Amino acid sequence: MGVGVIHIRPPGTSSMVLYTAGSSTSYPSHAPNGIRLHFLGGAREVGNVGCIIEDRSGTKVLIAYGLAPTKPPKYPSEAPPVNHAIMTHAHIDHIGMAPWLTNHRTTLHGTELTAAVSEIMWADTYKVSDIEGYPLAWDKRDLEAALESWVPHQFNTWFNVGEWRCRLHPAGHIPGAAMIEIQTPEATILWSGDIDTRNSPNAPKATPVECDI
């Protein structure tokens, strides 16, 4: 865990702002074969969630990219270039750093409601960071670009990410929250995100999904 490191992004560059990388595993330059998970944050902790999943086909996806709204905030480690990122839900510890991904022209996937609520959450994060005096790794231009990067999906509808098939399942938790099913040539993965197995007036409960991992 690194602390006390601050990199302010000059115009036209993509450096991350880091007060702390949180609990993470370094992204390797040469990864072994098989399905690999690399946590950019959120390992053994709550908040600043981010995880790269990839396999030998070269397909990879970033699951969530958030920040922990502590004082000072906790940010995840800098993400490698990714074409696709899937957001489970619109809480800031899961989507708070997603606007920074516009540096990589990353497509954002999630439910329609998560995409809609993200504008409110990102605008509020920007406002609070200004009031509290903590710089962000992204600015209003990134926020606007991120809103254009969304590709929303209905629950239980397949979409492709490289060589993989993915679909979203209700997760409970909050309206629009989703579990992510990923079918790879080697295994079926389920990323639960934050779940609730109880029905509520606003969100259907999470139910079991058959998977290998």
Model segments located where?
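His/Asp/Glu-rich metal-coordinating catalytic cores
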Residues: G22, Y27-E45, G50-I86, H91-I95, ...
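Short, Lys/Arg-enriched N-terminal segments with co-localized hydrophobic residues
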Residues: I8-S15
